[in-house]
Amino acid sequence: MNAGPTDEELLAAYAAGDARAFGELYERHERPVFRYFLRQGAAAALAEDLLQETWMAVIRNAERFEPRAKFTTWLYTVARSKMIDHWRGKDDAVSLDDAANDPDEAPLEVVGSEADRPDVRAVSRAQARAFVEAVEALPAAQREAFLLQAEGGLSLEEIAVVTQAGHETVKSRLRYAMTKLRSAMEDWE
């Protein structure tokens, strides 16, 4: 079974002039990067702006990408830089409530006939809101590491590159984040 071209192959094809390759890359990563911005505290409109700035940087720098690291590591490094550039000097943080109330962005999805029951849907929405609030309550460094792993699918090593933190530091941040999230969600088990 052929899984198709890798992200790195698609970026190389785009750099060589294949616009369809960029379209496929964008399609693969647009939603996870958008959710990363939302979960980091950006309102939907700001997340969209940051997403576009991130992809513009990918377009401008596609020819310079050297596949020593995975494309996703590079992409989330660019995304993180765009977010930091935006928030630098700002005191106003935005709530993640927009993401919690948007059914397309809910972190949990219930599928099946039981999901059609209003009481089950209400519990599912409440549980999703509780989870988003628990993620939002994490210290920034722990939240970022968790989101890069959960939303971006990055490995410990890749998160260390993106956040410019040591491997053991990233491991600790993820461990503390998971402990806090498990504790916050105990009532939902």
Explain the meaning of each model-derived region:
Residues 1-32, 112, 116, 126, ...:
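N-terminal module of bacterial RNA polymerase sigma factors
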Residues 10, 26-30, 34, 44-61, ...:
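Conserved RNAP core-binding helix
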Residues 15-16, 39-44, 53-70, 89-91:
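Sigma70-family region 2
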Residues 15-24, 34-53, 167, 188-189:
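Short, charged helix-capping/linker segments at alpha-helix termini
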Residues 49-56, 69-81:
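Structural recognition of an alpha-helix C-terminal capping motif at a helix-to-coil junction
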Residues 60-67, 77-98, 124:
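Arg/Lys-rich amphipathic alpha helix in sigma70-family domain 2
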